[in-house]
Protein backbone atom coordinates (compact mmCIF):
# COMPACT_ATOMS: atom_id res chain seq x y z
CA UNK A 1 0.00 0.00 0.00
CA UNK A 2 2.81 2.44 0.80
CA UNK A 3 4.36 2.07 -2.64
CA UNK A 4 1.06 2.69 -4.39
CA UNK A 5 0.33 5.64 -2.11
CA UNK A 6 3.64 7.26 -3.00
CA UNK A 7 2.92 6.67 -6.68
CA UNK A 8 -0.51 8.30 -6.40
CA UNK A 9 1.08 11.41 -4.94
CA UNK A 10 3.92 11.52 -7.47
CA UNK A 11 1.70 10.88 -10.48
CA UNK A 12 -0.78 13.52 -9.32
CA UNK A 13 2.03 16.09 -9.10
CA UNK A 14 3.19 15.28 -12.63
CA UNK A 15 -0.31 15.27 -14.13
CA UNK A 16 -1.12 18.62 -12.55
CA UNK A 17 2.04 20.10 -14.06
CA UNK A 18 1.72 18.52 -17.52
CA UNK A 19 -2.09 18.65 -18.02
CA UNK A 20 -2.26 15.75 -20.51
CA UNK A 21 -5.33 15.11 -22.63
CA UNK A 22 -5.00 11.38 -22.07
CA UNK A 23 -3.21 8.96 -19.74
CA UNK A 24 -2.33 5.50 -21.05
CA UNK A 25 -1.73 2.69 -18.57
CA UNK A 26 -0.50 -0.79 -19.37
CA UNK A 27 -0.68 -4.16 -17.65
CA UNK A 28 -1.25 -4.92 -14.00
CA UNK A 29 1.48 -3.29 -11.93
CA UNK A 30 0.98 -0.97 -8.98
CA UNK A 31 1.86 1.96 -11.24
CA UNK A 32 -0.94 0.90 -13.62
CA UNK A 33 -3.51 1.17 -10.85
CA UNK A 34 -2.00 4.39 -9.50
CA UNK A 35 -1.96 5.99 -12.95
CA UNK A 36 -5.55 5.06 -13.75
CA UNK A 37 -6.88 6.11 -10.35
CA UNK A 38 -5.02 9.42 -10.29
CA UNK A 39 -6.05 10.35 -13.84
CA UNK A 40 -9.65 9.43 -13.09
CA UNK A 41 -9.70 11.60 -9.96
CA UNK A 42 -8.30 14.51 -11.98
CA UNK A 43 -10.91 13.94 -14.72
CA UNK A 44 -8.31 13.06 -17.34
CA UNK A 45 -9.39 10.47 -19.90
CA UNK A 46 -7.61 7.17 -19.31
CA UNK A 47 -6.80 4.17 -21.49
CA UNK A 48 -5.93 0.74 -20.09
CA UNK A 49 -4.00 -1.56 -22.43
CA UNK A 50 -4.33 -5.28 -21.59
CA UNK A 51 -7.76 -4.67 -20.07
CA UNK A 52 -10.04 -7.52 -19.05
CA UNK A 53 -7.36 -10.09 -18.23
CA UNK A 54 -8.39 -11.96 -15.09
CA UNK A 55 -6.94 -14.68 -12.87
CA UNK A 56 -10.00 -14.53 -10.58
CA UNK A 57 -7.60 -14.71 -7.63
CA UNK A 58 -8.11 -11.61 -5.48
CA UNK A 59 -5.15 -12.76 -3.35
CA UNK A 60 -2.83 -11.64 -6.17
CA UNK A 61 -1.93 -7.93 -6.06
CA UNK A 62 -1.90 -7.91 -9.86
CA UNK A 63 -5.56 -8.96 -9.95
CA UNK A 64 -6.57 -6.03 -7.75
CA UNK A 65 -4.55 -3.73 -10.03
CA UNK A 66 -6.20 -5.12 -13.20
CA UNK A 67 -9.75 -4.83 -11.92
CA UNK A 68 -9.18 -1.37 -10.48
CA UNK A 69 -7.46 -0.02 -13.59
CA UNK A 70 -10.35 -1.26 -15.73
CA UNK A 71 -12.91 0.36 -13.45
CA UNK A 72 -11.12 3.72 -13.50
CA UNK A 73 -10.37 3.80 -17.24
CA UNK A 74 -12.51 5.39 -19.94
CA UNK A 75 -11.21 3.28 -22.82
CA UNK A 76 -10.30 -0.39 -22.46
CA UNK A 77 -8.09 -2.19 -24.98
CA UNK A 78 -8.59 -5.93 -24.51
CA UNK A 79 -6.04 -8.37 -25.94
CA UNK A 80 -8.36 -11.39 -26.33
CA UNK A 81 -11.99 -12.40 -26.80
CA UNK A 82 -11.98 -13.83 -23.26
CA UNK A 83 -10.80 -10.48 -21.89
CA UNK A 84 -13.66 -8.82 -23.82
CA UNK A 85 -16.12 -11.27 -22.25
CA UNK A 86 -14.78 -10.51 -18.77
CA UNK A 87 -15.29 -6.79 -19.34
CA UNK A 88 -18.80 -7.42 -20.66
CA UNK A 89 -19.69 -9.44 -17.54
CA UNK A 90 -18.33 -6.63 -15.35
CA UNK A 91 -20.52 -4.07 -17.14
CA UNK A 92 -17.61 -2.42 -18.94
CA UNK A 93 -18.30 -3.72 -22.45
CA UNK A 94 -19.30 -0.33 -23.84
CA UNK A 95 -15.79 1.00 -23.12
CA UNK A 96 -13.95 -2.07 -24.46
CA UNK A 97 -12.24 -2.64 -27.79
CA UNK A 98 -10.60 -5.86 -28.96
CA UNK A 99 -7.10 -4.85 -30.05
CA UNK A 100 -5.00 -7.99 -29.94
CA UNK A 101 -2.09 -8.70 -27.65
CA UNK A 102 0.81 -6.27 -27.89
CA UNK A 103 2.98 -8.71 -25.92
CA UNK A 104 2.55 -11.23 -28.74
CA UNK A 105 3.33 -8.49 -31.26
CA UNK A 106 6.46 -7.55 -29.32
CA UNK A 107 7.57 -11.17 -29.18
CA UNK A 108 7.08 -11.58 -32.93
CA UNK A 109 8.96 -8.35 -33.62
CA UNK A 110 11.93 -9.48 -31.52
CA UNK A 111 12.16 -13.19 -32.34
CA UNK A 112 14.79 -12.61 -35.02
CA UNK A 113 16.97 -10.57 -32.71
CA UNK A 114 16.53 -13.04 -29.88
CA UNK A 115 17.47 -16.03 -31.99
CA UNK A 116 20.66 -14.28 -33.10
CA UNK A 117 21.84 -13.63 -29.55
CA UNK A 118 23.64 -16.65 -28.22
CA UNK A 119 26.02 -14.85 -25.85
CA UNK A 120 24.14 -15.91 -22.73
CA UNK A 121 23.77 -19.46 -23.97
CA UNK A 122 27.47 -19.67 -24.77
CA UNK A 123 28.41 -18.29 -21.35
CA UNK A 124 26.42 -21.06 -19.68
CA UNK A 125 27.30 -23.77 -22.23
CA UNK A 126 23.65 -24.20 -23.23
CA UNK A 127 22.31 -25.30 -26.61
CA UNK A 128 19.35 -23.78 -28.43
CA UNK A 129 16.23 -25.82 -27.69
CA UNK A 130 17.90 -27.75 -24.87
CA UNK A 131 17.20 -25.58 -21.84
CA UNK A 132 14.31 -24.07 -19.93
CA UNK A 133 13.97 -20.33 -19.35
CA UNK A 134 12.70 -19.41 -15.88
CA UNK A 135 11.22 -16.12 -14.77
CA UNK A 136 10.34 -15.97 -11.12
CA UNK A 137 9.38 -12.78 -9.30
CA UNK A 138 5.84 -13.06 -7.90
CA UNK A 139 6.02 -12.21 -4.17
CA UNK A 140 4.21 -15.41 -3.16
CA UNK A 141 6.96 -17.43 -4.89
CA UNK A 142 10.09 -15.51 -3.98
CA UNK A 143 9.68 -13.58 -0.73
CA UNK A 144 9.77 -16.65 1.51
CA UNK A 145 13.20 -18.37 1.38
CA UNK A 146 11.70 -21.82 2.00
CA UNK A 147 9.18 -21.45 -0.84
CA UNK A 148 11.87 -20.27 -3.24
CA UNK A 149 14.18 -23.07 -2.13
CA UNK A 150 11.43 -25.67 -2.72
CA UNK A 151 10.76 -24.32 -6.22
CA UNK A 152 14.44 -24.32 -7.15
CA UNK A 153 14.93 -27.82 -5.74
CA UNK A 154 12.18 -29.14 -8.00
CA UNK A 155 13.47 -27.24 -11.04
CA UNK A 156 16.96 -28.62 -10.41
CA UNK A 157 15.63 -32.12 -11.19
CA UNK A 158 14.45 -31.27 -14.73
CA UNK A 159 15.89 -33.05 -17.75
CA UNK A 160 17.33 -29.84 -19.23
CA UNK A 161 19.28 -27.04 -17.58
CA UNK A 162 17.31 -24.03 -16.36
CA UNK A 163 18.44 -20.53 -17.40
CA UNK A 164 17.33 -18.15 -14.67
CA UNK A 165 17.62 -14.38 -15.35
CA UNK A 166 17.52 -13.01 -11.84
CA UNK A 167 14.88 -10.40 -11.00
CA UNK A 168 16.02 -7.89 -8.32
CA UNK A 169 13.18 -8.95 -6.00
CA UNK A 170 14.21 -12.60 -6.28
CA UNK A 171 17.89 -11.78 -5.78
CA UNK A 172 17.23 -10.50 -2.25
CA UNK A 173 15.79 -13.84 -1.13
CA UNK A 174 18.19 -15.94 -3.18
CA UNK A 175 21.12 -14.52 -1.22
CA UNK A 176 19.91 -16.52 1.81
CA UNK A 177 19.71 -19.84 -0.08
CA UNK A 178 22.53 -22.32 -0.58
CA UNK A 179 22.82 -22.85 -4.34
CA UNK A 180 25.84 -25.20 -4.24
CA UNK A 181 23.82 -28.35 -4.97
CA UNK A 182 21.79 -26.84 -7.80
CA UNK A 183 24.08 -27.36 -10.78
CA UNK A 184 21.16 -27.53 -13.21
CA UNK A 185 20.15 -23.92 -12.54
CA UNK A 186 22.15 -21.26 -14.38
CA UNK A 187 21.65 -17.80 -12.89
CA UNK A 188 22.24 -14.82 -15.16
CA UNK A 189 21.57 -11.09 -15.08
CA UNK A 190 18.12 -9.85 -16.16
CA UNK A 191 17.60 -9.92 -19.94
What label would you give each PLM region?
Residues 33-34, 86, 106, 172-174:
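Phosphate- and divalent-cation-binding pockets in alpha/beta enzyme and binding domains
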Residues 21-22, 72-75, 94-95, 159-162, ...:
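Short active-site oxyanion
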Residues 1-91:
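Active-site and donor-binding regions of nucleotide-sugar-utilizing enzymes
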Residues 1, 115-191:
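Donor-nucleotide binding loops and adjacent catalytic segments primarily
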Residues 72-147:
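A nucleotide-sugar donor-handling region in carbohydrate enzymes
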Residues 51-55, 101-102, 189-191:
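Short, acidic/turn-prone active-site loops that include or flank metal/cofactor-
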Amino acid sequence: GLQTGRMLEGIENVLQQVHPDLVITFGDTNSTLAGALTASKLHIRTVHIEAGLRSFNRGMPEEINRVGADQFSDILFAPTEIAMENLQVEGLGSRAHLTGDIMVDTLKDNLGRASERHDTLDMHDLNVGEYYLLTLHRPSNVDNPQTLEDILSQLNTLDYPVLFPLHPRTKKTLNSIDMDDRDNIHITKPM
